[in-house]
Amino acid sequence: MITKETIVAEVVTDYPKAADVFKHAGIDFCCGGAISIEQASQKSKLSLEALLSQLQQLERQSEPGGGLNPKYLSVASLIQYIQAAYHEPLKEELKQLTPYITKVAKVHGPQHDYLIELKALYTQYKNNMTAHTAQEDDHDFPKMIAFSNGQDVAEIEQIILDLKTDHDEVGQILKKMNQLTNDYTIPNEACNTWRLVYQRLQAIEKATYRHVHLENHVLFNKLHA
C-alpha cells in the first residue's frame, strides 16, 4: 500500500499513471524522485492527505505497470524496452517536429519573441538528447549488459554518474520550455501549426520524464544491486 514513507519514484515505477498526479501537484518524480511522498508534499500544491488520497485511489483502480512492470525485467530486456519505447520514437519525432518549430518561430517570432527562445531551447534539447541516446546505444548500454552478465566493467559507476548529469541538464531544459509556454497553454491567436507544436512538445516532455525515470530509478538501480 502507498504510504507517506513510500518513495515517489517507486510509485511511478509501479503505477505509471501516478506521474500525472505528481506533475499536477508540481512534484518532480524524475530526477528528484528519490524522496518520500511526505517530503514531496512539502513542496507540493497539495496537502499530504490529498496527495495520498489520489495516489491510493489510483492504486486501487490500477494494475501495477499496466501489465508490464519494468522493474522485473532483466537489464538487457529493460534496455531493449527503453530503446523501443523511447529512443527510436524520439529520434523520429525530433526529425518530424523540427520543421514545424522552425516555421512557428520564423512566422510568429517577430511578434512573440519567446517563440524564438523556445526554438533555441528545443534545439538544445534535440542536440543533447540525440547525442545522449546515441552514446547510450553505442557505448553505455552494451557496457551495462556486459556488467549485468558478470563481466568486470571498471567504469560502470562513472557511466551512471555521467548519464545522470545528462538527465539533470535535459530536465532543466524541459522546465524552461514549460515555464516559457505557461505549461504549453495555447494562446488564442495561435495558428494550427503553433497548436501542433505545443501539443507535441508537451508529449515529448511527458515521454522524456518517463524515459529518464526508467533509467535513473529502475535500470541504474539494477546495476547497483
Swiss-Prot record:
It comes from the Bacteria. It is found in: Cytoplasm. InterPro entries: Hemerythrin-like (IPR012312), RIC_family (IPR019903), ScdA (IPR023551), ScdA-like_N_sf (IPR038062). The keyword Cytoplasm applies. One of its GO terms (molecular function) is metal ion binding. GO terms for biological process: protein repair; response to nitrosative stress; response to oxidative stress. Keywords: Cytoplasm, Iron, Metal-binding, Stress response. One of its GO terms (cellular component) is cytoplasm. It holds the Pfam family Hemerythrin. Belongs to the RIC family. ScdA subfamily. Di-iron-containing protein involved in the repair of iron-sulfur clusters damaged by oxidative and nitrosative stress conditions. Homodimer. This is Iron-sulfur cluster repair protein ScdA. The gene is scdA.
